[in-house]
């Protein structure tokens, strides 16, 4: 019975602590709002700039995450279909248009088809190098498409800390100005300037850190994509070598 009462008491203490924590969060939010109201126009401009950088960066992060997730799924499906065929299937039969391997394969298939239709008497692929180059060009285009807007993340990660640092310096200058106007050292005189400095510093870091992490993660995905397309190009070239043996340039 005593153990039950002890458990009951701990539950009561836990339930009583929840409103206290909620009240603490509410008070912190209220204090943050008060600090923002006390900031000057320079700090507000800095915060608005950082907010714009942050919003666009997060939108780009979500868009890139969905894009790479879809690419990985469609690429796995595309490779499974391709490897299940003993001959070169037509691109429209692959049924996986969301994979970056699809335009790479289509470029190689068109080059093979054009060589077979060129009227050579033996119906052979005369230049395997031309097929490989056409696929490599298509792969380079897909890499460029995957790299779209990546410089924005790099710029956000490198520039926003300095924007926040500018707000920090301005806030410290404002604090010294308030201290000089008050004529005596007091917390009330320096609080607005210190608040500006701390808020802009935190905002700059909050904007820069996710952008840098996302940039490095997506850069790794792009390098992996390039490696997979290079490997797929060699795989297609090897299949063409088996299907159309003979003298080539």
Regions found by a protein language model. Give the residues of each.
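Short, strongly hydrophobic alpha-helical membrane anchors
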Residues: 2-39, 186
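Transmembrane alpha-helix/interfacial motif
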Residues: 39-91
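Hydrophobic alpha-helical transmembrane segments of polytopic membrane proteins
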Residues: 197-211
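Predominantly long cytosolic amphipathic alpha-helical stalk/bundle segments
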Residues: 71-166, 172-186, 213-249
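N-terminal membrane-entry
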Residues: 44-47, 147-154, 196, 200
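Hydrophobic alpha-helical transmembrane segments and adjacent short intramembrane/lumenal linkers
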Residues: 183, 188-197
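Residue-level signal for the membrane-embedded core of alpha-helical transmembrane segments
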Residues: 46-49, 53-56, 160-163, 167-170, ...
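Residue-level signature of catalytic and energy-coupling elements of molecular machines
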Residues: 40, 58, 91, 105, ...
